[in-house]
Amino acid sequence: MRIPFTKMQGAGNDFVVLDETQGRFGLSTAHYRLLADRHFGVGADQILTVRPSPAPGIDFEYLIHNADGAEVEQCGNGARCFARFVRDQGLTAKDAIRVQTRGGVIEPQLNPDGRVTVNMGAPVFELAEIPFDATGLQPQTSGLWKKWPLALVDSGHATTVYVAVVSMGNPHAVQVVDDVDTAPVRLQGPLIEHHASFPKRVNAGFMQIVDRSHIRLRVYERGTGETLACGSGACAAVVAGIRLGLLDDTVHVQTHGGTLTISWAGAAAPVLMTGPATPVFHGEINLPDNL
């Protein structure tokens, strides 16, 4: 079957965007893996799918599949690209839309400067809802929050890291490091992602505090690996930093792919994320009917 697509990127986090507003392509997990494959497919961190409104008061449904083909709840950088795509393709005339994801409703807003702001909703701290199993763990208390110990074992070598856990529609474990350039992201990332305390796996964030309004961040994404940027990861890191008493309520997040601005007023307030969303090219790909 021949599938049209648009390649997009937001702060270096890259996506294949599919329009299923006129009908579904019927793609399998293997199809999504092939689309994301950088050697045999188009290449992307995630595959984003646009579907028609599933309910009154909602403009579109937004599906996300990671590079491993698994469907996930949320993708912040993808949400900005989603909003840019539906406007550029004439699927809506609105600057602000309401979008249903598996992780809840989000509200992207196209700004006059070309950037997109996304209301990502309020962070979730209830451990069962993240989900995070803290059985047998003794946390450290810092600021308004707790940091949880995770025992990591690789090739017989054991270490313990302390993480703050939060859901931004998808689960995140954030640790503070002295220098993101030397942080063991590729070693610890997969160990944290698959840690037994996270029954649905987790995104692992490594945050360096530059000052109270500036952090540097690397994220090892669940099902994808390290990416140039992670929007929901940036939101989770800022929320963690604020709750730990380390950050102010508006923070510039520097990633390898660009800078995002994250604002959070605390408590049950929504997290606002602002950043770029850029079309790269349009194309078509032939996919096997049965895969």
From Swiss-Prot:
Annotated function: Catalyzes the stereoinversion of LL-2,6-diaminopimelate (L,L-DAP) to meso-diaminopimelate (meso-DAP), a precursor of L-lysine and an essential component of the bacterial peptidoglycan.
Gene Ontology terms describing biological process: lysine biosynthetic process via diaminopimelate
Gene Ontology cellular-component terms listed: cytosol
Residues engaged in binding substrate: N13, Q46, N66, G76, N77, N170, N203, E221, R222, G231, S232
Compartment(s): Cytoplasm
Protein name in UniProt: Diaminopimelate epimerase
The keyword Cell inner membrane belongs to this UniProt entry's keyword annotation: no
Keyword terms: Amino-acid biosynthesis, Cytoplasm, Isomerase, Lysine biosynthesis
Catalytic activity: (2S,6S)-2,6-diaminopimelate = meso-2,6-diaminopimelate
Gene name in the database record: dapF
NCBIfam families, per the entry: DapF
